[in-house]
């Protein structure tokens, strides 16, 4: 068990701000003393903190002994945010980018002409795929939606059950073109079967590759690996492709010299697809794109693509600065700095949002996601650690009243928590109402109520020491994971219409929402269970599985959960990309990418509690630092 110390709470724990209800009455603070959950647990101390954090108990001003996670402080103070500067908001940079966009569009269009530069029937397919893949990996594809569709329609026209060659008149198919085509077409919703890869196996059932690992051969296997990550449920050949290509590439990295190409391979192996957030991929690919020998001999000069990618990255960086300044003002104005019992990761959450949605018009999505996740974190730390069971029951009831007068029955520190939830959910609903043209508050309130009910159930398990069945814990945990409430209001603020039939395919009762919530619960528990258990929090996916299956070990449980995660990811891929869906990919993409963002945060550890290692690096690389032109 971690060391426990008893300390006095800081005097500013309770928010000094007076809150006013709708009638204009000032709410009078109510100081109450309530027995603490930890007392009932006979000294068992619990938190959902990272393994590197201790748990402290503290005696508050109202004489209640409280548990507090020993979280590190906010890493991004106001002075740092204010010190960020960027000249890329100037019109001249936008004008230069627009000229480059026009030139790249011309390059796309030239591929549609028989007399286009360097275009022949023997390489027209791979050229189109290379162009689409390049603009997507560089993070500039939003400018070329029409051109991308035209290019992929052309490729799909010549797709066969045996794949494609480099060009429409190629005599034989080849693995590189087919793998890149499978990946790219599938990501855009085209109906392409993974069985096409079986045609590239030898008689022994192995993928046919020469023993000599040339750069062209390695790149072919790299594209095979990238394709294998876009797998659907039940596709055995994709599992085989992933296993083969990952092993091949790891061996190749031991032999080839360090170069931009080896770095590209390393990045893809490190992040895969589900945790390789688009803006991070763009930042990394910018570094290798201009130096890659494949690109230097490619079908058009890379300078324009690279310059445009750098300009777009830095122009968005200037917008990020303004949005961060607004977010910090909101965070301070909400009274959040006085909530000393919880983690403050608003900048980190903003980073995740800006890594998956960097269209300028989606400021509401980015800021809404950061706000929603900040609220989720405050509630998480209050329900798991700081609040007593009686207090939490009062808070849960107050949320369902949805009126500032409900705070009269709450302890002082909860008044501030209640008001930030109340005000922020109302504000986000107003933004969503404007975007969707209808009232959204009641629908979104219901989502928040269900979320808090799930937290309340977990608080009861903590108080009693009960370890429920895996199924009971898992179903409740999918709700308490917070995926739904983190995604719902932000996606409704976008310019994408969400009529009722579409919303049902993204929010409940959709498989997309269920699977995204499942990944967050499963991956979160596999990263946090040891620390939770050391602090007395008994219930987790691991402990519940072991209870249901006597004789199993932690390793058995982890293997089972990791297998579940792999299956869930494939199910998520299908829900996003299934062909002939009545709901376009664009309507599902933000919710899907939120799942990727959370998954990224749990890639190495609990990156939300311990945000000063990999998460800090992500913030610096994608938000704080521009690229050099």
From Swiss-Prot:
GO MF, one example: metal ion binding
Necessary cofactors: Mg(2+); Mn(2+); K(+)
Location of the transit peptide in the chain: 1-48
EC number, as in UniProt: 4.2.3.119
Binding annotation for Mg(2+) 1: 380, 384
Pathway recorded for this protein: Terpene metabolism; oleoresin biosynthesis
GO terms of biological process kind: alpha-pinene biosynthetic process; diterpenoid biosynthetic process; geranyl diphosphate metabolic process
Entry's cofactor comment: Binds 3 Mg(2+) or Mn(2+) ions per subunit.
Protein name: (-)-alpha-pinene synthase, chloroplastic
Gene that specifies this protein: PT1
